[in-house]
């Protein structure tokens, strides 16, 4: 390439460097566009930095927990989040937030979305938007052999029940105390910041039962060597959702499209099957 003779010597010396920088920028942009086009999806403005930040209450197996001996986050939510990020052509970053802090973290922008076995409720719908992705219910976890004979939800009356703070299950216990367990036969509720603490209280004899997501209860039983069991009853079947900020329509649409693709190509089913959660597969039409 010939340069005009009238360019100052300094500019003539810098121009080749500038052209190299420009070429590198254009090449990187083309590479990103090619990667995005290959998936048919383009990340929304919220993900312009190339990172999808997911808020999760860790640990809460089988949805999110660290693999033994490593710092790798695994579980239904973790694996789905990685697959969604891959579909969108971005990286994923997990942010550990307790159950009560999930929505505030989303609202103030610390995370882009919540994937944390979060049930969709009317109260939460007033604050954030949801993309449904899993169905389940509340399980009742008891010691092996079920010594107290708890079989249904109203059998929890007069019993001590451990539950995690900031969860639908705590709301369910409070509702029992104003309905089936009202009038002096209330459930004695013990709250804990982590699910594992509630289970430890049950093991130590400080509680007669734990109420938690049914999938989590099944996972606790699987790891208990017979010392725990879940009763054959689910309280209030519910739907879990990916939480996004109100007004983030482009991000919601992008995640919805990405999830629909995972459902169509089988990756969604594969993830749930791998965690023994086939009963939670969401087959409704996404909207």
Per-range role (PLM):
Residues 36-117, 265:
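Extracytoplasmic small-molecule ligand-binding "clamshell" domains
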Residues 78, 93-104, 148-149, 188-200, ...:
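Short helix-initiation/N-cap motifs at beta->coil->alpha
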Residues 58, 135-142, 222-260, 277-287:
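Periplasmic-binding protein-like
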Residues 31, 78-87, 146, 152-160, ...:
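Extended ligand-binding regions for polar small-molecule ligands
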Residues 66, 82-88, 169-191, 221-223:
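Ligand-binding cleft/hinge of the Venus flytrap
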Residues 101-104, 118-125, 174-175, 203-236:
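A ligand-binding cleft/hinge motif common to bilobed small-molecule-binding domains
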Residues 82, 91-155:
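Acidic, polar ligand-binding/catalytic clefts
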Residues 26-29:
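C-terminal motif of bacterial Sec signal peptides marking the signal peptidase cleavage site
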């Amino acid at each position: 390439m010939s340069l005009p003779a009238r360019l100052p010597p300094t500019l003539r010396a810098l121009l080749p460097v500038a052209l190299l920088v420009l070429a590198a920028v254009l090449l990187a942009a083309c590479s990103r566009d090619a990667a995005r086009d290959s998936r048919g999806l383009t990340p929304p403005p919220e993900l312009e930095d190339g990172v999808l930040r997911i808020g999760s209450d860790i640990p809460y197996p089988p949805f999110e927990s660290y693999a033994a001996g490593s710092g790798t986050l695994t579980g239904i939510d973790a694996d789905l989040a990685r697959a969604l990020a891959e579909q969108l052509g971005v990286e994923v970053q997990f942010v550990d937030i307790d159950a009560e802090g999930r929505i505030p973290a989303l609202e103030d922008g610390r995370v882009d979305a919540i994937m944390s076995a979060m049930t969709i409720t009317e109260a939460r719908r007033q604050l954030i938007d949801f993309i449904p992705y899993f169905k389940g219910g509340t399980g009742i976890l008891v010691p092996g052999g079920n010594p107290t004979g708890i079989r249904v939800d109203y059998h929890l009356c007069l019993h001590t029940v451990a539950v995690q703070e900031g969860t639908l299950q705590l709301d369910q216990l409070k509702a029992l105390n104003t309905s089936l367990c009202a009038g002096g036969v209330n459930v004695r509720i013990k709250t804990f910041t982590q699910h594992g603490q509630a289970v430890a209280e049950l093991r130590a004899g400080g509680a007669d039962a734990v109420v938690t997501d049914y999938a989590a209860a099944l996972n606790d039983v699987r790891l208990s060597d017979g010392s725990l069991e879940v009763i054959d009853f689910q309280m209030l079947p519910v739907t879990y959702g990916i939480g996004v900020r109100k007004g983030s329509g482009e991000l919601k649409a992008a995640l919805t499209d990405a999830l629909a693709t995972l459902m169509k190509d089988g990756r969604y089913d594969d993830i749930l099957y791998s965690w023994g959660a086939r009963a939670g597969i969401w087959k409704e039409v996404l909207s």
